[in-house]
Curated annotation (Swiss-Prot):
Catalytic activity entry: beta-L-arabinopyranose = L-ribulose
One of the GO BP terms on file: L-arabinose catabolic process to xylulose 5-phosphate
Gene name of the record: araA
Protein name as it appears in the record: L-arabinose isomerase
Binding site for Mn(2+): 310, 337, 354, 453
Stated family: Belongs to the arabinose isomerase family.
Names of required cofactors: Mn(2+)
Cofactor binding summary note: Binds 1 Mn(2+) ion per subunit.
Gene Ontology cellular component terms for the protein in this record: cytosol
EC numbers on record: 5.3.1.4
Protein role: Catalyzes the conversion of L-arabinose to L-ribulose.
One GO MF term: L-arabinose isomerase activity
Keywords: Arabinose catabolism, Carbohydrate metabolism, Isomerase, Manganese, Metal-binding
Biological pathway: Carbohydrate degradation; L-arabinose degradation via L-ribulose; D-xylulose 5-phosphate from L-arabinose (bacterial route): step 1/3
Length: 505
């Protein structure tokens, strides 16, 4: 049994330096020393989230090919960074780049920041040739169709490190999805279209394994929870949450809280034993469960599990990826759903929530643990955490199956404080203003056919999802402050043509 983690500590990125034997041993030694220094600066930078491992300078085709194969075989290696310190004839890179299956970043940099104007000679020029060595390298990558991110500048520059760090987080999300197993308890909500999808194609495209288990397999785990285990979990609830009086020990609804704890214990046991990193439930398929899982889902998401409601495994995958990509950053990631609008002119905003399952990592406050009726599902009143999402920048992201490909849509948003308290709304919630405005955002979202379930991340911005989609060779449409509906509609049409042509080629 393995506990879920979002840590990036077990991941590493290899730092590669290109050159050639033409330069001689003395120059190649300088290349090695200076490239080690660049790698060291990255490794020691606080905004670089993954370990950087320097590799010996690559000077010929055989060593480059072997490096690519070794990287492919290394589970902990989530990507490669390459820099051509000198001129490295790009035909040497063909076999290696063609074989490479890991995310790739081309760092266009050099050892020095400023030119030593008064002392520059031809030895300096021959040693520091990235300005044209990387152009040769860029050509062969483009000719081979290598998917990569290109970052330009010195690693001492904050924006350069930030861009590299963002790509590393995307590569970590890609690695996490590739090792992800999703357990679906029951099927999709009946007659719902957008939560459907091609699970076989998803395994081919993203590496994720999605399979279904009968809900009563989970019920057996819930029923096996012991009184001692439940007591310990209820003790934990009392330290973390403001519990409604009727749910406390001795209260008339305390047994409902204990059953909610049993659901959490059963779910965690099932997921850990099966090595799952994400799961789905459906209120239409609850088997012998007495409550729709609410509190348990919220707490498991907070630990790092992906989750999708109503059988929505695509959103569960996105949430798991977002949890890993945001590792160590303030904020959180959660299932979210656009519910209703505030349409007062000049004040337009969206109220988002779900029946129960919003992750408490979206708040720094102390949630309230409550019990209320639920009008669907036909079961006992479920327990859940209630809170307001912290104000601040965020992004909401959805995935749809468009028949011939998957499409990811991301909207940059600003979570805002509630205009007034919501004393009669018994669920966790978020209120946000979408960029560029509600009318344009909603029209673009509908034009894209984006899903009504999303992951809301307050940890990472849209650039992480841009890098993730690029690594995955998956369509991404972004709605932000620069979006116009006319331009967005054209982009949707262009993308349709491009992705269909790309598949054919």
């Amino acid at each position: 049994m393995s506990r879920i983690t979002t840590s990036l500590d077990h991941y590493e990125v290899w730092f590669l330096t290109g050159s050639q034997n033409l330069y001689g041993e003395e120059t190649l030694q300088q290349v090695a020393e200076q490239s080690q220094e660049i790698a060291r600066q990255l490794e020691e930078a606080s905004d670089i989230p993954v370990r950087v491992v320097w590799k010996p300078v690559l000077k010929d085709s055989d060593s480059i090919r072997r490096m690519a194969l070794e990287a492919n075989a290394s589970d902990g290696t989530i990507g490669l960074i390459a820099w051509m310190h000198t001129f490295s004839p790009a035909k040497m890179w063909i076999q290696g780049l063609d074989a490479l299956q890991k995310p790739f970043l081309h760092l266009h940099t050099q050892a020095n920041v400023a030119l030593p104007w008064s002392s520059i000679d031809m030895d300096f020029m021959n040693l520091n040739q990235a300005a044209h060595g990387d152009r040769e390298f860029g050509y062969i990558q483009s000719r081979l169709g290598v998917v990569r991110k290109t970052v330009v500048g010195h690693v001492s520059t904050e924006s350069v490190r930030a861009s590299i760090g963002t790509w590393m987080r995307a590569a970590a999300g890609w690695a996490a999805v590739h090792e992800l197993k999703v357990a679906r308890f029951g099927d999709n909500m009946r007659n719902v279209a957008v939560t459907e999808g091609d699970k076989t194609e998803a395994e081919l495209k993203f590496g994720v394994s999605v399979n279904t288990w009968g809900v009563n397999d989970l019920v057996a785990r819930v029923d096996a929870a012991t009184d001692a285990e439940i007591d310990a979990l209820v003790d934990e609830y009392e330290t973390l949450y403001d519990i409604q009086p009727e749910l406390r020990r001795g209260g008339e609804r305390h047994e409902s809280l204990r059953y909610g704890a049993a659901i959490e214990l059963g779910l965690r046991s099932f997921l850990e034993e099966g090595g799952f990193g994400a799961f789905t439930t459906s209120f239409e398929d609850l088997g012998g469960l007495r409550q729709l899982p609410g509190l348990a889902v919220q707490r498991l998401m907070a630990e790092g599990y992906g989750f999708g409601a109503e059988g929505d495994w695509k959103t569960a995958v996105l949430i798991r990826a977002a949890k890993v990509m945001g590792s160590g950053l303030p904020g959180g990631a959660s299932l979210m759903e656009d519910y209703t609008y505030h349409l007062v002119p000049g004040e337009e905003k969206i109220l988002g929530a779900h029946m129960l399952e919003i992750c408490p990592t979206l708040t720094t406050g102390r949630p309230s643990l409550e019990i209320h009726p639920l009008g669907i599902g036909g079961r006992e009143d479920p327990v859940r955490l209630v809170f307001d999402t912290d104000p601040g920048p965020a992004v909401v992201v959805a995935m749809s199956d468009m028949r011939d490909r998957f499409r990811i849509v991301a909207n940059v948003v600003e979570v805002v404080p509630l205009d007034e308290p919501l004393p009669n709304l018994p669920v966790a919630r978020a209120v946000w203003k979408p960029a560029p405005d509600l009318a344009t955002s909603a029209a673009a979202w509908l034009t894209a056919g984006a899903a009504h379930h999303t992951v809301m991340s307050t940890q990472v911005g849209v650039e992480v999802f841009e890098d993730f989609a690029e690594i995955a060779r998956t369509e991404l449409l972004v709605i932000d402050e620069d979006t116009t509906l006319k331009g967005f509609t054209k982009e949707v049409r262009w993308n349709q043509a491009y992705h269909r042509l790309a598949q054919g080629l």
